[in-house]
Amino acid sequence: MRGFTYLSKVLHSHSSYSKLLVLCSVSTGGLLVYAESNVESGKQVVEQNQPESKKKRVVVLGTGWGGTSFLKDVDISSYDVQVVSPRNYFAFTPLLPSVTCGTVEARSIVEPVRNIIKKRSGEIQFWEAECLKIDPVNRTVSCRSGINDNLAGHNDFSLQYDYLVVAVGAQVNTFNTPGVMEHCHFLKEVEDAQRIRRTVIDCFEKSVIPGLSEEERRTNLHFVIVGGGPTGVEFAAELHDYVYEDLVKIYPSVKDFVKITVIQSGDHILNTFDERISSFAEQKFQRDGIEVSTGCRVTSVSDHFINMKVKSTGKHVEVPYGMVVWSTGVGTRPFVKDFMEQVGQEKRRILATDEWLRVKGCSNVYALGDCASVDQHKVMEDISTIFEAADKDDSGTLSVEEFRDVLEDIIIRYPQVDLYLKNKHLLEAKDLFRDSEGNEREEVDIEGFKLALSHVDSQMKSLPATAQVAAQQGTYLARCLNRWDQCKSNPEGPRRFKSSGRHEFLPFEYRHLGQFAPLGGDQAAAELPGDWVSMGHSTQWLWYSVYASKQVSWRTRYLVVGDWVRRYIFGRDSSRI
C-alpha cells in the first residue's frame, strides 16, 4: 500500500512526464494500468513566429501513408519540416470497409497528426489546409484553409520550400461514367465509410415502412458494389456479415429481400491476387449468396437504376438498386493535374517520377503513393550506352567477364533484369549469352547483346496503388534526405551509364510483404512472399494480428482490438449516427 501511495505521489508531481490511464473492465472486474512516458516533453514547442531557420525547408503535402511514414523517419535536426493537409489525422485506410458496417469505429482507425508530431518533440509544423497550386519555378505552394469561415483571420496563405514532398493520394476515377458522381458512394476517406454506414441503415429503415410493395423493398435492399478489387470484395464481405449476423435479427420482415451484387469488368474478382485466391473468393461468395457479375462494364447510373453492358453478349442491362458503392479507378487531383501541365506531363494519366521518386520535369520535388507512379527505365532504351560502358577495352565486343563486372549495377538500375534472370532460371551472366540453340558464347557484339536482353523489359511491372507501397516510399525518401550530405560526397548508388560516376542513392526498391483479402465469415485469404497462399479461418486470425501490429500508435491498436472484441460479444451497432 505504501508503494502505491509513493507511486501516486511521484506520478502527481511529475505529470508532464507521464500519464496514468486506468481502465476498469466491467465484465471481468480486472484493472489495467497503462503509463505513457514522454521524456522529450521538457523541450519547448517550436512557435510559428520563430526566427528564420538555416535548415532546409521541407514541405509535405498530405498525411496519408506516404506522408506519415516520411514524417516519422525524417531527421528534423537537419530539416525544417512543415506539413499541409485538409485532414488533421492519419487514417488506417485498409480498415475502412470495417468502418462501413460498424465492425470498427471510425475514431479507432485515426490518429491525430499533432499526436504524431508531438512524438517528434513538436519540431514539425502542421497546417490544416488544402493545397491549391504548386509553383515549381518560385518554389512555393498556395494553400487555403477549409476551417469555418466565420472565424477571424484569412484563409489563404503560401509556403516556400527547398524540397517538396507530394503525398496527397488520389481521388476516385469515374471514367466519365454518367451519374456516378451524383448517385454513387465511394470508399476513399473516413467520411465516405460513415456515409455508407448511414445509407445502409436508411435502406433497411425505408424497407420496413408499411405500404411498400415487394418490388420496392427488393430495390431498396439491393446493394451493388462496382469493382472487384480488394476494397470492393472486402466491403461486400463485410456488408454480408453485417446483414446476416446483425441486421436480419432486428429487421426480420425483410431478410428475404436483401441482395448483394459485385460488378467486375474483368473475368475474375481479385485479379491482382493469385488465381487460387480469386477462385476461392468466387466460390465463397457463391455459397454466401453474393452475386458476382464478371465481364460487365457500367455505362451509366441514374437515381434508381444502374446500367451495364455485358461484354460477352453486347447486351445492355438495367438493374434497380438501393445503394451503389463505386470502388474502382484511381484519379488525379485537380491541383496535381495543373502541376503536371507545368512540368510537361500534361499527356500523362498520373504524375511520373524517376526511380528516386523525383518528379520528372522539375527539381527538388518528390511524389509518393497513389498520386504518382515510378517511370522505370527500359533496358533497350539504354542498351547502347550500357554496352559502351561495359566494353572496357573498346574492342567492340563484350566478354562474359566484362558483363559480369557491371551486372550488379545493371540489376540495381534496371530491376527487371533480375526478374528476367530469376524467371528464366539463369544463374550466371554466361547463361544470358547463350545463342538461340543454347550454346555458350564467350563474347557478343552489340547486336548479340541486344538479342540477349531483348525480352527483359517484358518483366517490368508498375507498382500497385496500395498503402504498403506508399509507406515504403515515405520511409525510403526520409532516409535519403537524412543521408543527403554523406551520399553527395560518397555516392552509394549504381554507376551512371550515360555519364561518369555513380548515383548518390540506391533507387527505390519495393519489397512486397504480402496482401490480405478478408472474405467474411471469419475467413480470409493471404498471398505472402515465397509463393505462399493461405485461405480460411486461420488466415483471418493472421489478418487480425498483422493489422493490429501495423496500427500507427498504441492508442489506435487498443481501440481497434477492443472494437473486434466488442463485435464478437455484442454484435455491430445499427444506430443511425
Curated annotation (Swiss-Prot):
Its main location: mitochondrion. A motif (Microbody targeting signal) lies at residues 568-577. It catalyses: a quinone + NADH + H(+) = a quinol + NAD(+); a ubiquinone + NADH + H(+) = a ubiquinol + NAD(+). Its cofactor is FAD. Binds 1 FAD per subunit. It is a peripheral membrane protein. Its EC number is 1.6.5.9. It is found in: Mitochondrion inner membrane; Peroxisome. Ca(2+) binds at D391, D393, S395, T397, E402. One of its GO terms (cellular component) is mitochondrial intermembrane space. It comes from the Eukaryota. NAD(+) binds at residues 221-257. FAD binds at residues 57-87. SUPFAM superfamilies: EF-hand, FAD/NAD(P)-binding domain. Transmembrane segments: none annotated. Belongs to the NADH dehydrogenase family. This is External alternative NAD(P)H-ubiquinone oxidoreductase B1, mitochondrial. It comes from Solanum tuberosum (Potato). The lineage of its organism: Eukaryota, Viridiplantae, Streptophyta, Embryophyta, Tracheophyta. The gene is NDB1.
